Amino acid sequence: MAKSRFEYVREYEVHDTLLPETYIVVRIDGKHFHEFSQHYSFEKPNDERALKLMNASAKNVVMAYSGDIILAFGESDEYSFILRKDSTLFRRRRDKLSTLFVSLFTAQYVALWPKFFPEQPLSHKRLPFFDSRCVCYPNTTVVKDYLCWRYVDTHINNLYNTVFWNLVLKCNLTPREAEQRLSGTLSSDKQEILFSECGVNYNNESEMFKKGSLINRKGEIMHIDVVKQIDELFAGF
Protein backbone atom coordinates (compact mmCIF):
# COMPACT_ATOMS: atom_id res chain seq x y z
CA MET A 1 0.00 0.00 0.00
CA ALA A 2 1.33 3.41 -0.94
CA LYS A 3 2.31 5.64 1.95
CA SER A 4 2.37 9.40 2.24
CA ARG A 5 4.47 11.67 4.38
CA PHE A 6 1.37 12.42 6.43
CA GLU A 7 0.90 8.87 7.65
CA TYR A 8 2.98 9.49 10.76
CA VAL A 9 -0.11 10.97 12.42
CA ARG A 10 -1.36 7.41 12.99
CA GLU A 11 1.28 7.10 15.69
CA TYR A 12 -0.90 9.29 17.90
CA GLU A 13 -3.72 6.74 17.91
CA VAL A 14 -4.09 4.81 21.16
CA HIS A 15 -5.72 1.38 21.18
CA ASP A 16 -6.90 0.34 24.63
CA THR A 17 -6.98 -3.46 24.74
CA LEU A 18 -9.19 -5.00 27.41
CA LEU A 19 -7.65 -7.46 29.85
CA PRO A 20 -7.36 -11.03 28.56
CA GLU A 21 -9.24 -13.91 30.19
CA THR A 22 -11.88 -11.63 31.69
CA TYR A 23 -15.58 -11.42 30.99
CA ILE A 24 -16.40 -8.29 29.01
CA VAL A 25 -19.71 -6.55 29.64
CA VAL A 26 -20.81 -3.96 27.11
CA ARG A 27 -23.65 -1.92 28.59
CA ILE A 28 -25.63 0.47 26.44
CA ASP A 29 -27.89 3.09 27.97
CA GLY A 30 -30.40 5.46 26.39
CA LYS A 31 -29.52 9.15 26.52
CA HIS A 32 -32.22 11.68 27.34
CA PHE A 33 -34.82 8.91 27.15
CA HIS A 34 -37.04 10.76 29.59
CA GLU A 35 -37.61 13.45 26.97
CA PHE A 36 -37.63 10.86 24.18
CA SER A 37 -40.36 8.80 25.86
CA GLN A 38 -42.43 11.91 26.53
CA HIS A 39 -42.15 13.03 22.92
CA TYR A 40 -43.49 9.70 21.64
CA SER A 41 -46.04 9.36 24.46
CA PHE A 42 -44.74 6.14 25.99
CA GLU A 43 -47.21 4.64 28.45
CA LYS A 44 -46.42 4.98 32.16
CA PRO A 45 -45.07 3.21 34.11
CA ASN A 46 -44.15 0.78 31.32
CA ASP A 47 -44.69 0.83 27.59
CA GLU A 48 -44.82 -2.75 26.37
CA ARG A 49 -44.08 -1.80 22.77
CA ALA A 50 -40.99 0.17 23.74
CA LEU A 51 -39.62 -2.70 25.83
CA LYS A 52 -40.28 -5.21 23.06
CA LEU A 53 -38.49 -2.91 20.64
CA MET A 54 -35.47 -2.89 22.96
CA ASN A 55 -35.62 -6.69 23.15
CA ALA A 56 -35.87 -7.13 19.39
CA SER A 57 -32.93 -4.79 18.84
CA ALA A 58 -30.82 -6.59 21.43
CA LYS A 59 -31.74 -10.00 20.02
CA ASN A 60 -30.39 -9.01 16.61
CA VAL A 61 -27.14 -7.89 18.23
CA VAL A 62 -26.88 -11.20 20.07
CA MET A 63 -27.51 -13.20 16.91
CA ALA A 64 -24.91 -11.18 15.01
CA TYR A 65 -22.24 -12.15 17.56
CA SER A 66 -23.65 -15.32 19.11
CA GLY A 67 -20.21 -16.92 19.07
CA ASP A 68 -18.94 -14.30 21.51
CA ILE A 69 -22.00 -13.26 23.52
CA ILE A 70 -23.08 -15.51 26.38
CA LEU A 71 -26.14 -13.59 27.54
CA ALA A 72 -27.79 -10.20 27.28
CA PHE A 73 -30.01 -8.57 29.88
CA GLY A 74 -32.23 -5.55 29.48
CA GLU A 75 -34.43 -3.27 31.53
CA SER A 76 -36.01 0.07 30.69
CA ASP A 77 -33.66 1.84 28.24
CA GLU A 78 -30.50 -0.17 28.94
CA TYR A 79 -29.03 -3.47 27.79
CA SER A 80 -25.97 -5.41 28.92
CA PHE A 81 -24.14 -7.84 26.65
CA ILE A 82 -21.84 -10.36 28.35
CA LEU A 83 -18.96 -11.69 26.25
CA ARG A 84 -17.01 -14.88 26.84
CA LYS A 85 -13.71 -14.76 28.74
CA ASP A 86 -11.88 -16.08 25.70
CA SER A 87 -13.55 -13.75 23.20
CA THR A 88 -11.12 -12.16 20.76
CA LEU A 89 -13.76 -10.08 19.00
CA PHE A 90 -12.02 -7.04 17.48
CA ARG A 91 -8.92 -8.16 19.38
CA ARG A 92 -10.66 -7.01 22.57
CA ARG A 93 -10.18 -3.35 21.67
CA ARG A 94 -12.31 -1.21 23.96
CA ASP A 95 -13.09 1.47 21.38
CA LYS A 96 -14.08 -1.03 18.71
CA LEU A 97 -16.34 -3.06 21.00
CA SER A 98 -18.01 -0.04 22.56
CA THR A 99 -18.74 1.70 19.26
CA LEU A 100 -19.72 -1.51 17.47
CA PHE A 101 -22.33 -2.55 19.99
CA VAL A 102 -23.89 0.87 20.48
CA SER A 103 -24.04 1.65 16.76
CA LEU A 104 -25.44 -1.76 15.83
CA PHE A 105 -28.03 -1.58 18.59
CA THR A 106 -29.08 1.94 17.61
CA ALA A 107 -29.32 0.96 13.94
CA GLN A 108 -31.56 -1.98 14.86
CA TYR A 109 -33.70 0.24 17.10
CA VAL A 110 -34.30 2.75 14.32
CA ALA A 111 -34.88 0.06 11.68
CA LEU A 112 -37.39 -1.82 13.85
CA TRP A 113 -39.21 1.26 15.14
CA PRO A 114 -41.98 1.18 12.46
CA LYS A 115 -42.83 -2.41 13.42
CA PHE A 116 -43.62 -1.43 17.01
CA PHE A 117 -44.76 2.17 16.50
CA PRO A 118 -46.33 2.17 13.01
CA GLU A 119 -48.50 5.20 13.79
CA GLN A 120 -45.58 7.31 15.06
CA PRO A 121 -42.76 7.88 12.55
CA LEU A 122 -39.46 8.91 14.08
CA SER A 123 -38.75 12.61 13.82
CA HIS A 124 -35.27 13.71 12.80
CA LYS A 125 -35.56 16.27 15.58
CA ARG A 126 -36.08 13.56 18.21
CA LEU A 127 -34.03 10.48 17.36
CA PRO A 128 -32.93 7.76 19.80
CA PHE A 129 -29.31 7.57 20.78
CA PHE A 130 -27.35 5.62 23.36
CA ASP A 131 -24.02 5.64 25.12
CA SER A 132 -21.96 2.56 25.93
CA ARG A 133 -19.17 1.36 28.15
CA CYS A 134 -17.03 -1.77 28.42
CA VAL A 135 -16.19 -3.27 31.81
CA CYS A 136 -14.03 -6.32 32.52
CA TYR A 137 -14.98 -8.78 35.26
CA PRO A 138 -12.27 -11.18 36.45
CA ASN A 139 -14.20 -14.36 37.14
CA THR A 140 -17.55 -16.11 36.99
CA THR A 141 -18.53 -15.12 40.52
CA VAL A 142 -18.21 -11.41 39.81
CA VAL A 143 -19.95 -11.47 36.44
CA LYS A 144 -22.80 -13.49 37.99
CA ASP A 145 -23.12 -10.82 40.66
CA TYR A 146 -23.18 -8.16 37.94
CA LEU A 147 -26.14 -9.85 36.25
CA CYS A 148 -27.91 -10.32 39.59
CA TRP A 149 -27.34 -6.62 40.34
CA ARG A 150 -29.06 -5.56 37.12
CA TYR A 151 -31.91 -8.02 37.78
CA VAL A 152 -32.49 -6.75 41.33
CA ASP A 153 -32.25 -3.17 40.09
CA THR A 154 -35.04 -3.97 37.63
CA HIS A 155 -37.33 -5.08 40.45
CA ILE A 156 -36.53 -2.10 42.67
CA ASN A 157 -37.04 0.45 39.91
CA ASN A 158 -40.15 -1.16 38.49
CA LEU A 159 -41.90 -1.50 41.83
CA TYR A 160 -41.26 2.15 42.66
CA ASN A 161 -42.32 3.38 39.22
CA THR A 162 -45.43 1.19 39.19
CA VAL A 163 -46.65 2.55 42.51
CA PHE A 164 -45.60 6.12 41.71
CA TRP A 165 -47.43 6.29 38.40
CA ASN A 166 -50.53 4.56 39.72
CA LEU A 167 -50.70 7.12 42.52
CA VAL A 168 -50.45 9.89 39.93
CA LEU A 169 -52.70 8.44 37.22
CA LYS A 170 -55.29 6.56 39.30
CA CYS A 171 -55.27 8.34 42.63
CA ASN A 172 -54.77 11.84 41.23
CA LEU A 173 -51.75 12.69 43.35
CA THR A 174 -49.27 15.19 42.03
CA PRO A 175 -45.79 13.83 41.28
CA ARG A 176 -44.52 15.62 44.37
CA GLU A 177 -47.26 14.12 46.54
CA ALA A 178 -46.59 10.64 45.16
CA GLU A 179 -42.89 11.03 45.87
CA GLN A 180 -43.62 12.07 49.45
CA ARG A 181 -46.09 9.20 49.89
CA LEU A 182 -43.39 6.68 48.94
CA SER A 183 -40.57 8.28 50.89
CA GLY A 184 -39.06 5.85 53.39
CA THR A 185 -41.27 2.92 52.37
CA LEU A 186 -40.07 -0.67 52.08
CA SER A 187 -40.89 -3.04 49.25
CA SER A 188 -43.77 -4.55 51.23
CA ASP A 189 -45.12 -1.08 51.99
CA LYS A 190 -45.12 -0.14 48.33
CA GLN A 191 -47.01 -3.28 47.35
CA GLU A 192 -49.59 -2.61 50.06
CA ILE A 193 -50.04 1.01 48.90
CA LEU A 194 -50.43 -0.19 45.32
CA PHE A 195 -53.08 -2.73 46.31
CA SER A 196 -55.04 -0.86 48.99
CA GLU A 197 -54.97 2.62 47.46
CA CYS A 198 -54.79 1.91 43.73
CA GLY A 199 -56.47 -1.50 43.50
CA VAL A 200 -53.53 -3.06 41.68
CA ASN A 201 -51.93 -6.38 42.64
CA TYR A 202 -48.23 -6.18 41.84
CA ASN A 203 -48.08 -9.96 41.40
CA ASN A 204 -50.32 -9.61 38.35
CA GLU A 205 -47.97 -7.22 36.58
CA SER A 206 -46.16 -8.45 33.46
CA GLU A 207 -43.12 -10.64 34.12
CA MET A 208 -41.22 -8.55 31.58
CA PHE A 209 -41.87 -5.45 33.66
CA LYS A 210 -40.95 -7.08 36.97
CA LYS A 211 -37.98 -9.21 35.92
CA GLY A 212 -36.50 -7.58 32.85
CA SER A 213 -35.54 -9.54 29.74
CA LEU A 214 -32.78 -12.11 29.36
CA ILE A 215 -31.59 -13.24 25.93
CA ASN A 216 -29.47 -16.35 25.47
CA ARG A 217 -27.13 -17.00 22.57
CA LYS A 218 -29.92 -18.84 20.71
CA GLY A 219 -31.91 -15.62 20.67
CA GLU A 220 -34.53 -16.82 23.14
CA ILE A 221 -36.05 -13.98 25.17
CA MET A 222 -36.93 -14.97 28.73
CA HIS A 223 -38.38 -13.25 31.77
CA ILE A 224 -37.06 -15.32 34.66
CA ASP A 225 -35.72 -15.06 38.21
CA VAL A 226 -32.07 -14.49 37.34
CA VAL A 227 -30.85 -14.82 40.93
CA LYS A 228 -32.39 -18.27 41.37
CA GLN A 229 -31.15 -19.54 38.00
CA ILE A 230 -27.79 -17.78 37.84
CA ASP A 231 -25.65 -20.94 38.09
CA GLU A 232 -27.64 -22.65 35.35
CA LEU A 233 -27.31 -19.63 33.09
CA PHE A 234 -23.51 -19.73 33.26
CA ALA A 235 -23.10 -23.50 33.04
CA GLY A 236 -20.27 -24.22 30.62
CA PHE A 237 -18.91 -20.67 30.71
From Swiss-Prot:
Reaction(s) this enzyme catalyzes, per UniProt: a 5'-end ribonucleotide-tRNA(His) + GTP + ATP + H2O = a 5'-end phospho-guanosine-ribonucleotide-tRNA(His) + AMP + 2 diphosphate + H(+)
Cofactor(s) needed by this chain: Mg(2+)
Top EC class for this record: transferase
Residues the entry annotates as binding Mg(2+) 1: 29-30, 77
EC number of the protein: 2.7.7.79
GO terms for MF: GTP binding; identical protein binding; magnesium ion binding; tRNA guanylyltransferase activity
Cofactor note: Binds 2 magnesium ions per subunit.
Entry keywords, A to Z: GTP-binding, Magnesium, Metal-binding, Nucleotide-binding, Nucleotidyltransferase, Transferase, tRNA processing
The protein, known as: tRNA(His) guanylyltransferase
Species of the source: Eremothecium gossypii (strain ATCC 10895 / CBS 109.51 / FGSC 9923 / NRRL Y-1056) (Yeast)
Organism classification: Eukaryota, Fungi, Dikarya, Ascomycota, Saccharomycotina
